[in-house]
């Protein structure tokens, strides 16, 4: 990576998010669907054509520590969220940021957005349930953005516990 900031997009799809990072970032896409992985390679320096887990990541890229890890619209599809979070922590450097964007169950319920509940999403999270999951792994939400997308969603910014100041948005 030559001293560049390193970003990993898990569930990178066609690389849309990665294309917006500056060229001075080392961009890694994790995408299990072969057709999308091929598209993603236009914007990623490296594409791992597999589901994310520490073992496959380490085999492909070695024991790298990443600056930014994103999981956009895929966190609610996980069969083993504890294992996933544990594996993300293993690839993050101590000052790294993990960003999750997903449907927000509280907004969905208050807006009666039941049409956004779909069979492939295995779980939906509130901030408290996500914080409890992250705390088991020594991670915490340090900032949050509520969004209107998909009947209500939230983007959470996560770090190693105690590394960054926690924004007032987390307490509101």
Residue ranges, per PLM feature:
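Flexible, glycine-/basic-rich loop-and-beta segments that form/coincide
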Residues: 150-172
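Conserved SAM-binding motif I beta-strand of class I
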Residues: 26-31
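A short glycine-rich, Lys/Arg-flanked "PGG" loop and its adjoining helix->strand segment in the class I
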Residues: 82-97
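Conserved class I S-adenosyl-L-methionine
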Residues: 3-13
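Conserved SAM-binding strand-loop segment of SAM-dependent methyltransferases
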Residues: 43-57
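Conserved SAM-binding loop of SAM-dependent methyltransferases across substrates and taxa
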Residues: 14-24
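A conserved beta-strand element that flanks and buttresses the S-adenosyl-L-methionine
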Residues: 67-70
